[in-house]
A protein has these predicted regions:
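Thr-biased low-complexity repeat/linker tracts and other Thr-enriched repetitive architectures
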Residues: 56-134
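Intrinsically disordered, low-complexity terminal regions
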Residues: 1-40, 45, 57, 93, ...
Length: 211
């Protein structure tokens, strides 16, 4: 898969993207060089991963979508939704006008804020608090150093399911608003995958075969 790399020359003095707009919907990976601050796009719809290196963040007037992961050295912000087939990780905050959805984990050095729901296939971790207009759900743990809010939408009266926080376990944080439902962590499957064995003086790494 092809990787496009954006540098300072692709942005104007206001950090707005001025390059080829075909990159906004690109069938490949997108990388943004370090130390650019928060760079701004109309939207991003990337087939592969999006990576903004150290001290670079991403802001989109509309949505941000990646078939794989989204990672930024600083913040990630979208006027509508943020969606990744894999994980979403930001050195500072993650904020979306609509929902935030990740196939694996969501991790922010600061806060996580969504106008609608927050959903992760793995865990959710925030250096500050977590705020969602609707539900928060993940399969593993939720960790927050501060408070957690779910169901803060102002465009309707939230139903019970709109303010439910579903997770395997609440590892840290205070539920300030919302209904916590801890469903238990999935059992760890015993596997030899990745283990190193030595046979006749030679080392081999085991790989589990799919049935």
């Amino acid at each position: 898969m092809e990787t496009k790399k954006l540098t300072k020359k692709d942005f104007n003095d206001h950090n707005e993207f001025i390059g080829d707009e075909s990159i906004l919907s690109f069938n490949g990976n997108l990388e943004i060089e370090e130390s650019l601050g928060c760079v701004k796009f109309k939207w991003l719809n990337i087939k592969g991963y999006i990576l903004a290196k150290a001290f670079s963040g991403i802001k989109a007037g509309e949505g941000i979508k990646a078939g794989e992961g989204i990672e930024a050295g600083s913040g990630i912000e979208a006027g509508s939704g943020i969606k990744a087939g894999e994980g979403i990780k930001a050195g500072s905050g993650i904020e979306a006008g609509w929902g935030i959805e990740a196939g694996s984990g969501i991790k922010a050095g600061e806060g996580i804020k969504a106008g609608e729901g927050i959903e992760a296939g793995w865990g959710i971790e925030a250096g500050w608090g977590i705020e969602a207009g609707l539900y928060i759900t993940c399969k593993l743990t939720i960790s927050s150093k501060l408070r957690i809010f779910a169901g803060l939408c102002i465009w309707k009266i939230p139903k019970e399911e709109d303010k439910t926080i579903i997770c395997g376990k609440l590892a840290s944080g205070t539920i300030e608003y919302g209904i916590l439902n801890e469903v238990g962590l999935p059992e760890k499957k015993e596997t030899c995958d990745g283990k190193i064995v030595e046979i006749e003086g030679k080392k081999y790494q085991l790989k589990e075969q799919e049935k």
